[in-house]
Amino acid sequence: MLPDWINSECPAPSGAHRESALARQAQLTKPLGALGRLEEVAVELAALQAAEKPAAERVPVVLFAGDHGIAAQGVSAYPPEVTVQMLHNFAGGGAAIAVLAHSLGCPLEVVDVGTLADGQMRGVVVDKPRRGTRDFSVEQALTPADVAFVSEAGLRAVARQADHAPDLVIFGEMGIGNTTSAAAIAAALLACAPADIVGSGTGLDAEGRARKAKVIEDALTRHGLTAATPVAEVLAAVGGLEIIAMAGAIVAAAQRSWPVLVDGFIVSVAALVATRLNPSCRPWLLFSHRSAERGHAVVLDALGARPLIDLDLRLGEASGAATALPILRLACALHNGMATFAEAAVSGREA
């Protein structure tokens, strides 16, 4: 069901560069550890980039969009046509991630991997096996061929970013109903009750959240999904095209030794899928923020992740990762630019 490349081992981060970065941090004109997570992320980037001077300047953002048949069950506060309308907004520069990417100097690529849009759209790459998933409350969301195709779409999207020579990459998503698909995937893979995963998504009230959880619970039962179900079968049963594309893109980026700055709940579920398919990609993941979406904390815990910021964001679109990017840039600037005790003729800590 999934292509063979997705199992290929990802390179390991450079232990030598990690040790060198740690040694440099110990020599900078500050108490060791005084810059907290800024020190940690700089050291991690140095190891991932195998660089004496880590960087976070060249950062392409790739946004994957897809529609969801499950939206017919009233699991979103917005109608399905919003997905395609938002594609025009992304391409026109009016969406949050478009503004953030422009402000940060990040190239933005929008990829339609499965919206209901018919034909080409200006400013959007179209690479999809079908127009939307099927309603997984009544049938399989996708065929095995769909799952394979869209994972390859993630690989192709990563290949298109090579000309940017990325320091790291950011992936994002758009798709009405995709928090339902993400919650269903997470509930299956983690053996969690849907009620413990489901959040407000685009703004559901308590009644809407309960309905959403029941839809997922019934679907997991219908498809016989458990923690023992192979990942590819879970994806075919309840997956989303953009979620699978991001999982493929995460593995493909890690195989190229590109760090991935992971966004919120839905991208974290894609990261969970990626690590289940290829555990060697896990060291290449940096986690940007803790979303206000209820299930995000559960998924972060399963991944052993420590996000950088917590601003109650729940938009998606890679907006949280983009918001955290300046922190990575400042961490690199401090690591690379601060003087050592010797350079500044400042006395170091006494033994």
From Swiss-Prot:
The gene is cobT. Belongs to the CobT family. PANTHER family: NICOTINATE-NUCLEOTIDE--DIMETHYLBENZIMIDAZOLE PHOSPHORIBOSYLTRANSFERASE (PTHR43463:SF1). GO terms for biological process: cobalamin biosynthetic process. Catalyzes the synthesis of alpha-ribazole-5'-phosphate from nicotinate mononucleotide (NAMN) and 5,6-dimethylbenzimidazole (DMB). The keyword Ligase does not apply. Gene3D superfamilies: 1.10.1610.10, 3.40.50.10210. Pfam families: DBI_PRT (PF02277). SUPFAM superfamilies: Nicotinate mononucleotide:5,6-dimethylbenzimidazole phosphoribosyltransferase (CobT). It catalyses: 5,6-dimethylbenzimidazole + nicotinate beta-D-ribonucleotide = alpha-ribazole 5'-phosphate + nicotinate + H(+). Pathway: Nucleoside biosynthesis; alpha-ribazole biosynthesis; alpha-ribazole from 5,6-dimethylbenzimidazole: step 1/2. Its EC number is 2.4.2.21. Keywords: Cobalamin biosynthesis, Glycosyltransferase, Transferase. It comes from Bradyrhizobium sp. (strain ORS 278). The active site is at E317 (proton acceptor). This is Nicotinate-nucleotide--dimethylbenzimidazole phosphoribosyltransferase. It is an enzyme of class 2 (transferase). GO terms for molecular function: nicotinate-nucleotide-dimethylbenzimidazole phosphoribosyltransferase activity.
